Curated annotation (Swiss-Prot):
Homology family: Belongs to the CobT family.
Organism: Xanthomonas campestris pv. campestris (strain B100)
EC number, as in UniProt: 2.4.2.21
The reaction(s) this protein catalyses: 5,6-dimethylbenzimidazole + nicotinate beta-D-ribonucleotide = alpha-ribazole 5'-phosphate + nicotinate + H(+)
Domain of life of the native organism: Bacteria
Keywords, alphabetical: Cobalamin biosynthesis, Glycosyltransferase, Transferase
Gene that produces this protein: cobT
Pathway(s) annotated for this protein in UniProt: Nucleoside biosynthesis; alpha-ribazole biosynthesis; alpha-ribazole from 5,6-dimethylbenzimidazole: step 1/2
Function: Catalyzes the synthesis of alpha-ribazole-5'-phosphate from nicotinate mononucleotide (NAMN) and 5,6-dimethylbenzimidazole (DMB).
Classification via Pfam families: DBI_PRT
Biological process, per Gene Ontology: cobalamin biosynthetic process
TM regions (residue ranges): none
Name of the protein described by the UniProt record: Nicotinate-nucleotide--dimethylbenzimidazole phosphoribosyltransferase
Record: active site: E316
Gene Ontology molecular-function annotations: nicotinate-nucleotide-dimethylbenzimidazole phosphoribosyltransferase activity
Length: 348
């Protein structure tokens, strides 16, 4: 399978339905704009779903797990074995995102792309194995061209499965010790930012640890200074799970499935996806502003205003999942409120 598919045309939201939904908002029993962004969200989902009465009930959450060679540089508070251990935890339902998915009635897909501490075959985990870890970005490219192709395809496969269920919203998450370092390095390359501006606490680093992380990122950027395109930067500085997110975002936009983007790492993947296929941007909604240092710069680059700011930095799609009740509320208000005519209330 080639990767030419990533440049395929994205779906286009329905402008007629959008106009009809906006007209309905103007007739609901409230002052115009009184429900603020909730009104905008309902109209946006109407256009995405081509339905004047949108709902957000069928949700697909995919968490991509993979290890990183750069973990050998001591950039995390946790040992690399944690990635594989968390895959087991996802499968058993004990992780934060597993709890949130149950509360939301969402489908949770866990994808093992390659971890050092391999848990083997698990009943609730899709095995899309590429390698035990991507390479150390301080020494060589994170992925070979074939590995990048396979990681992108693993993300697209999530969307192929989600489409068969009539999914109304896709949420992507990640797990991988060292992946905030890879995401920060990738973001620096895409945004021409200094490592000191993008390196954050990740799993809980102190000031000394963050400074070391920035030094590691500086080394990686020097090794890959000649990476000239977004795709090549992804291949050299990213990781399997970051590339899978990129593939999922592009495939979702092509399929007309809205995406709720999670935190720092997921937003770095979103920026790559938009660079590779600008039509993706119209299908992205951003769940929250992470506590991770570099997230604000990524959001600015995407001209994105997230729904929440709760000082989260867990990943796993957890922050995005927390925002889903807001989307449901927006649609419920849009669909359930009476118009002035229906209620017999005088309009302004």
């Amino acid at each position: 399978m080639s990767i030419e598919w990533i440049q395929g045309a994205c779906a286009v939201p329905d402008a007629r339905v959008q106009a009809a939904a906006l007209a309905r908002q103007e007739q609901l029993t409230k002052p115009p704009g009184a429900l603020g962004r909730l009104e905008q969200l309902a109209v946006q989902f109407a256009a995405w779903q081509r339905n004047e009465q949108p709902t957000v009930q069928r949700i697909w959450i995919a968490v991509y797990a993979a290890d990183h060679g750069v973990a050998a540089e001591g950039v995390s508070m946790f040992p690399q074995a944690v990635t594989g251990e968390m895959v087991r935890n996802f499968a058993r339902g004990g992780a934060a995102i597993a709890v949130l998915a149950r509360e939301l009635g969402a489908r949770l897909e866990v994808v093992n792309l390659g971890v050092v501490n391999d848990p083997g075959e698990l009943s609730r985990v899709r095995r899309a194995w590429i390698a035990p870890a991507c390479a150390n970005i301080c020494e060589q490219a994170a992925m070979t061209p074939a590995q990048l192709r396979d990681a992108l395809a693993a993300g697209a496969e999530s969307i192929a499965q989600a489409r068969t269920c009539g999914t109304q919203l896709f949420v992507g998450g990640e797990m991988g010790i060292g992946n905030s370092t890879a995401a920060a390095a990738l973001s620096c390359a895409l945004l021409s930012q200094f490592p000191q501006a993008m390196a954050g606490a990740g799993t809980g680093l102190d000031a000394e640890g963050i400074a070391h992380k920035a030094t590691v990122i500086t080394r990686a950027l020097a090794v890959h200074a000649d990476a000239a395109t977004p795709l090549e930067r992804l291949r050299r500085l990213g990781g399997f799970e970051i590339a899978a997110l990129v593939g999922a975002y592009i495939a979702a936009a092509q399929a007309g499935i809205p995406v709720l983007v999670d935190g720092f790492i997921s937003t770095a993947a979103a920026l790559v996806a938009v660079h590779l296929n600008p039509g993706v941007r119209e299908w992205l909604l951003f769940g929250h502003r992470s506590q991770e240092r570099g997230h604000a710069a990524l959001l600015r680059a995407l001209e994105a205003e997230p729904l929440l700011q709760l000082d989260l930095r867990l990943g796993e799609a957890s922050g995005a999942a927390v925002a889903i009740p807001l989307l449901r509320t927006a649609c419920a208000l849009h669909n359930g409120m009476a118009t002035f005519a229906e209620a017999g209330v005088s309009d302004a």
